[in-house]
């Protein structure tokens, strides 16, 4: 099926994908824009997975102070090139992540940044609670991974649901940005400050 330049332009504006990628997606999906968007997102996420291991030596430190001035966040958002680091959409992503940190108070970026002793301690606490409920060892082994997943969702930034769209996690937002910018993007670290807090 032949696709029009208007369709290609519309798809480019909606996805940020290249012209040839848009043309191919529209041809593959018979000119259906919605299906082409889905196709490009899936393709983009596949590309994002390939980029995940690449080094992120550029980026920005994004500052956010909540309206009352009593809570603030500094977040290090990393990327591969200064071109992306200076992009308004990259900075908007950083502000979105900083707002998330302000609202949800995560303790760590991901489970990889949690000290091993803290994970072991949490596992022990969860096992003890399950034993106290009368659960058997084989039941505990099945339940414990779900308890730990919930624990990670509570304290790890990338596993938290976005405060703006709870159908997505912060990791989903990062993966979408990787697909959009065509390079790896990571959260290096963050600090949350609160008046009267420790």
From Swiss-Prot:
The function of this protein is: Associates with the EF-Tu.GDP complex and induces the exchange of GDP to GTP. It remains bound to the aminoacyl-tRNA.EF-Tu.GTP complex up to the GTP hydrolysis stage on the ribosome.
**Species this chain originates from:** Leptospira biflexa serovar Patoc (strain Patoc 1 / ATCC 23582 / Paris)
One GO cellular component term: cytoplasm
Region: Involved in Mg(2+) ion dislocation from EF-Tu, residue numbers: 81-84
Q: Which family does it belong to?
A: Belongs to the EF-Ts family.
Q: What top-level branch of life does the organism fall under?
A: Bacteria
Does the entry feature the keyword Protein biosynthesis, yes or no? yes
Q: Indicate yes or no for the key word Lipid biosynthesis.
A: no
Q: Which GO terms describe its molecular function?
A: translation elongation factor activity
Indicate what this protein is called per its UniProt record.
Answer: Elongation factor Ts
Looking up HAMAP family in the UniProt record yields:
EF_Ts
Keywords, ordered alphabetically: Cytoplasm, Elongation factor, Protein biosynthesis
Major subcellular site: cytoplasm
Matches recorded under PANTHER family: ELONGATION FACTOR TS (PTHR11741), ELONGATION FACTOR TS, MITOCHONDRIAL (PTHR11741:SF0)
Enumerate the subcellular locations listed in this protein's record, separating them with semicolons. Answer: Cytoplasm
């Amino acid at each position: 099926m032949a696709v029009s330049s208007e369709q290609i332009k519309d798809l480019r504006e909606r996805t940020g994908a290249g012209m040839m990628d848009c043309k191919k997606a529209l041809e593959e999906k018979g000119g259906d824009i919605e299906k082409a968007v889905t196709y490009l997102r899936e393709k983009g996420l596949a590309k994002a997975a390939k980029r995940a291991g690449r080094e992120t030596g550029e980026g920005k430190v994004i500052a956010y102070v909540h309206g009352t001035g009593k809570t603030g966040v500094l977040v290090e958002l990393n990327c591969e090139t200064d071109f992306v680091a200076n992009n308004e959409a990259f900075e908007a992503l950083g502000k979105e992540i900083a707002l998330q940190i302000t609202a949800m108070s995560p303790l760590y970026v991901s489970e990889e940044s949690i000290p091993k002793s803290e994970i072991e301690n949490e596992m022990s606490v969860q096992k003890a609670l399950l034993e106290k409920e009368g659960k058997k060892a084989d039941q505990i082994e099945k339940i414990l991974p779900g308890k730990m997943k919930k624990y990670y969702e509570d304290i790890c930034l990338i596993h938290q649901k976005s405060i703006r769209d709870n159908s997505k996690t912060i990791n989903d937002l990062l993966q979408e940005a990787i697909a959009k910018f065509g390079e790896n993007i990571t959260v290096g670290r963050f600090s949350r400050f609160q008046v009267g807090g420790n």
